[in-house]
Amino acid sequence: MADIKSMFNKMSSPKQNGTGEPAPAKGQKGAIEKIYQKKSQLEHILLRPDTYIGSVERATETMWVYDKVKECMMQKELTSVPDCSFPGLYKIYDEILVNAADNKQRDPKMDVIKIDINQETNTISVYNNGSGIPVVMHKDEKMYVPTMIFGHLLTSSNYNDEEEKVTGGRNGYGAKLCNIFSTKFTVETASKQYKKHFKQTWGSNMTKASEPKIKDSGKDDDFTKIVFSPDLAKFKMEKLEDDIVLLMSRRAYDVAASSQGVKVYLNGERLKINKFKDYVDLYIKGKDDENGQPLKVVYEKVSDRWEVALTISDMGFQQVSFVNSIATTKGGKHVDTVADSVVKNVLEVLKKKNKGGVNIKPYQVKTHMWLFVNCLIVNPTFDSQTKENMTLQAKSFGSKCNLSEKFITAVTKCGLVESVLTWAKFKAQDQLVKASGKKQSKLKGIPKLEDANDAGTKNAHLCTLILTEGDSAKTLAVSGLSVVGRDHYGVFPLEGKPLNVRDASHKQVLENVEINNLIKILGLQYKKKYNSVDDLKTLRYGKVMIMADQDQDGSHIKGLIINFIHHNWPELLKLPFLEEFITPIVKATKKDKEISFYSLPEFEEWKKETENHHTYNIKYYKGLGTSTSKEAKEYFQNMDRHRIRFKYSGPTDDHHIELAFSKKGADQRKEWLTNHMDEVKRRKEIGLSERYLYTKETKTVTYSDFVNLELVLFSNGDNVRSIPSMIDGLKPGQRKVIFTCIKRNDKREVKVAQLAGSVAEHSAYHHGEQSLAMTIVNLAQNYVGSNNINLLEPRGQFGTRLSGGKDSASPRYIFTLMSPLTRLIFHPHDDPLLVHEFEDNQKIEPVYYLPIIPMVLVNGVEGIGTGWSTKIPNYNPRDIAENLRRLLDGEKPKVMHPWYKNFKGNVEGFGDKYVISGEAAILPGDKIEITELPVGTWTHNYKENVLEPMLGTDKVKPLISEYREYNTDTTVRFVVSLLPGKLSEIEAEGIHKVFKLQTTISMTCMNAFDYNCCLEKYDKVEEILREFYDLRVKYYVRRKDYLEGQLQAEADKLSNQARFILKKCDKGLVIENKKRKAMVEELIKRGYAPDPIADWKKRASKIQGLTALEDDDAQESEEEEPEPDPKGKPVDPDKAFQQLKEVKKFNYLLGMSMWMLTKEKKDELLKQRDQKLTELTTLKNKTAPMLWREDLDAFLIKLDEVEDKERREELNVNKKTSKAMAGKKNRKSMFDIIPSENGRRVEPKISDDLIKRIQAAEKAKTRKEIKKEYDPDDPTGISPSSGEKKPKARVKKEKPEKAEKPDKVDKAEKTDGLKQTKLTFKKEPKKKKMTFSGSSSGEMSASDAEVEVLVPRERTNARRAATRVQKYKDGSDDSGSDSEPELLDNKIDSDHEAPQTLSISDEDDDFNIKKNPAKKPAEMDSDCLFDSLIEDAKKDEPQKTLTKSKSESILIRRLNIERQRRCDTSVPPKEKAAPKRKLMNVDKDEKKTKKRPARVMLDQDSDDEDSIFDSKKGKKKTAANPKKKAKKKVESDSESDFNISDSSLSD
């Protein structure tokens, strides 16, 4: 202890420093005091004004001011404007003005503000007629309230952050700063409530003050008037300059605009501003947009707290905004919130209108906006006292700025969208120019380019670039170059189809390698116009020749290249720049004769005109790769025949190119294709062949002819591939699969991959087999939402409703087989009536099948083609069959509604739409059970896109606490647990809406090919049913006629065969040893007809117009060659052919074997004949409708069998599963997939909101309706009122003293994810916690939280009246208010002696402890000081370990008091120790004498941590105010501060 004491004496010696070295000399000491200074707050404000009011340095900046002549706001360069945009002088004026505007919020009756600025007298006055300042003596401060708030720093009525205020005042500086920077400052106010009139004047920068003049005001109205004369010297001015007066005058207009219902007068003249919109008009008056039109302003008063106006800006983003009448010239969170909302909606419009432009980002949209915002924000925060930038987070605004749809629509029409698009177009062109090519002789880095030797040279205009379709075509072209040479011909292969640049995005164009390579090869330059042949000499090639296949895809490639050039350089098409190279599509050869055809219609015409066409060898060329190198050389040798030049025929060509490739021309394209189909139909009816483009004399082709005669075939083919037939409901790919399956007639399952190969072989499928495999998979799928009748059986994993069929296995692993229903739907008796397609001289699938029911309705269809699209829902096959029966009976069909196999939800009609609803039920315990999803909503997608977001994210509040899955591959079951109190809200909103369990199906896009192969639009399902019925009845008549003829022919054949056998057995007919001609003549003479079946088929094909009835018909032309005469004489070919044909007709008799002459065979033939005749009689007795009924009955019986089999298989699986899961736990798991019996079903309803959405979608079909189911801050879609309290987190069981903020709930829910509500927490001690709604981060450390808990804000004034220590055991410091420590400094800096009641020190004299008055601290020796500190430490130790007895405590206290008296120097009674504020107002000599005691008190802070620690354990210790400690570091946390009743240490 002695060593410690000596060390302490050494350190505390005034003659030595901490190291024991001599202290500095007196001269040095003086220099230190000069360097390290302390200023009062008043001195600091005057010395460093930029901290409080902004810079006072002179500068020049452009700002908005009011022009009296033009009566509008103008931008002007103003002097005395500092770097921070506001001069100090302007700021002190603004503080007074904002105070006047704030009074409107306190007194709604206030309606006048008067502002007078007198430059000559340097006087500014601000008057308002709102509630006056209370003219009453402040009980604590012992002064009048006006005196306190205008003459004492850090005084304010805005310190209670618990109160929601929408005023501008906040920190307690405002008006005092104006007082400090004024030579004279007068306050005059009248309070009607207190019936007093008050007036007081300050001077000399608030260092002097007059006595307040108080008088009775009687019944005078309330008012407050501030008159001040700025201290111009402080602002480096000699007088109020014109520029600063202009700025002050504009601020008057600001207040008139931002203060609703207030008349503002400036220098006696009322300002003509009645509303915020009038103020906005002052800014845009006389300003025009880029088209010379006046700017359009879009204005909306969103609520009582928000007004927003917007127009376009050509000077970057501009904003004029006010928060509680404060001009936030730098904006802030309120401006960002509004701007972001506008930008988000504008971007959605821009995405649709700017698909061909550069990628537009949000900040680029904002750059074109000029935003005006006037708002009232609850307790706003700013980044500085100048209040130019509002920093409060949007969640704490106290209100929301929800812009209406009407406002957003008006914004998109005010010119903002056009302005952004213009900028985007300019930006795109600028980037494209950089990507242009140039003329150069050698190019590097372009793979597969075979460059011409003269490309890019002086002879470049003689060069031709050949663009080929793929590498195989390039090989063909290179082979041909050996004929024409490589100097003037280059070759470049295209990989696939070029980009359609007309509607491609700017990014797509820039990143498309093929387009960029083409530009470099040709040397094209964006934005350059090529108007003459001389301009072509600037390119690397003078011509472009397109060498593509002569099929529909090749035509499309040609069109895309034409479109590429026309879109960027339309002038090039007017010059001889573009050509095409055509090759034969069919070649007919006979010996040395070869005929080439360049289109199929031309070949068909030749076949009709040439009788012996069957004697020619026909070869089809599917692509350029089919031609040999020899043929390539032949093509190039006859260049004139194969080279076709494109010719520009006028504006019509431009129109047709845009028609074919512009997305804007969708309606015109539909009309174009419809006209084409009608023309094909008309020519077919009158027996004309299709039109074709290339003839033997064709040398040039106009662009219009190319589009209308060649490119139209591709577009029509696209529709044929994408849109099904109304009759069989199949697309060509699906029809090819069914055709192959019927032809194969497999009895055993076949692998899907193998079946795909077989389809490609038998049906001439020219595309990849992978797409065929997916077509097979789709035909076999049977999950909910796919097929009502799957035509193929799924044997393996063909996909489920979990992922909408995307989870199917590879085609290599799954098998399929034709469904037993397929041949009942596509009846074999209809096969002979089908008209088949032919390709490559091969008979393939029919044009359409003839099902017994309209399969287009059974399985529905979706497809998008060129100019056309279709969507037809599924219907119940039983309903369809029933309606067909009603039509057969002559009755009106019943109305049918969409129906999906195994779908458990609800389908309800609404106008021309249907609402498909899932199934939901309410379970006990605030749970929702979802047991069915809308059709087309797949289980995995629903979980990820709907349920997952409901759990909450960083930006979205949670709606549910968790969800559990009990789904299978065929059923759906989610059990969703809601947050407490949410069920009633969700029920009110609609469970189906909140959980997105409703979708709509439109009935306005039902398009399909009719029986004439023309696209037809159907308005109602009944129209499809009726058209199918009419056609099918005709075909049933034809089927009956065909079957009757077939049975009669078969009976005649059997009868002839039986008669022939009888005659032969009776030896009545001798044919042996006779020539064939004699044999045939003998048979004809005896009445034997040629083959009756073949003869009937021939007649039937002519009558019914069928192209082919049986495969063996095609063999009639393949006759055997006549044998040469043995004598060598030439044979007459026609005569020999005729003889062979006649002989073949009697093969059914002459070709019978000897076994046919037996009696058994004869009897069998007669029996078969009788059976055919019986069948014929039965058939003749039936009508066509009867045949149809029989087919329908057989189909429905089989349908029941198939579905019963599926149910039995499912039941058997469940039984097996039940046995395997015999345990109790397993049984529970099995029953989890079954809907609960305790659920209350929620009846789906069509809400008004859904109706509005449907109607809006109907009005604007081109615009996709985006309906927000959830508010960004509220995923439930329920927007509670701004003042509504949010429910507390479920984990909190005890009742909270104060509702937590929404962000706290978010945090609790997000921390532990799905299982949050399942956790159990240990109950914590009940502590009074406080939320930090104003905190920007929303978080605080644990230690900070404890300090706030222990020092409640409600105890602010309790200390001053305290007489007992017990009242302060939980802490008496008011750490909840940030301004309290500043208030202390303010009072110290005040030049007016305040009453002692304003003391806020921790001394006992503040508590009115009179037993032993506090003494002024004096010098004490080091021993006394050391002893006092040691005793303080000893007093703390026992409390940490054990509890002392009462007598021991008293003894220690007395010893401590005795030592205190020994060490202190007494103070005379008259000089009672002053409060802390008074002590710091003494002169410099007094401050020097107090130097050592201050160091003593600093050392007493060593026990802070222990004190705080003990307070947590429930001891009687109290943590000092941390904010005070940070300021002064002099308070003590020891118990002696509060528990010594006899005496206490003073500062």
Swiss-Prot record:
- Mark out the compositionally biased spans (Acidic residues): 1109-1123, 1373-1383
Task: List every stretch annotated Disordered.
Answer: 8-30, 1107-1134, 1209-1249, 1261-1423, 1459-1547
- Matches recorded under SMART domains: TOP2c (SM00433), TOP4c (SM00434)
* The keyword Transferase belongs to this UniProt entry's keyword annotation: no
Q: Which cofactor does it need?
A: Mg(2+); Mn(2+); Ca(2+)
Which GO biological process categories is it annotated with? DNA topological change; resolution of meiotic recombination intermediates; sister chromatid segregation
Map out region (Interaction with DNA) in residue numbers.
Answer: 351-353, 996-1005
> How is the cofactor bound, in the record's words?
Binds two Mg(2+) per subunit. The magnesium ions form salt bridges with both the protein and the DNA. Can also accept other divalent metal cations, such as Mn(2+) or Ca(2+).
Task: Report further notes.
Answer: Eukaryotic topoisomerase I and II can relax both negative and positive supercoils, whereas prokaryotic enzymes relax only negative supercoils.
Q: What is the name attached to this protein's record?
A: DNA topoisomerase 2
Q: Which organism is it from?
A: Bombyx mori
Q: Which gene encodes it?
A: TOP2
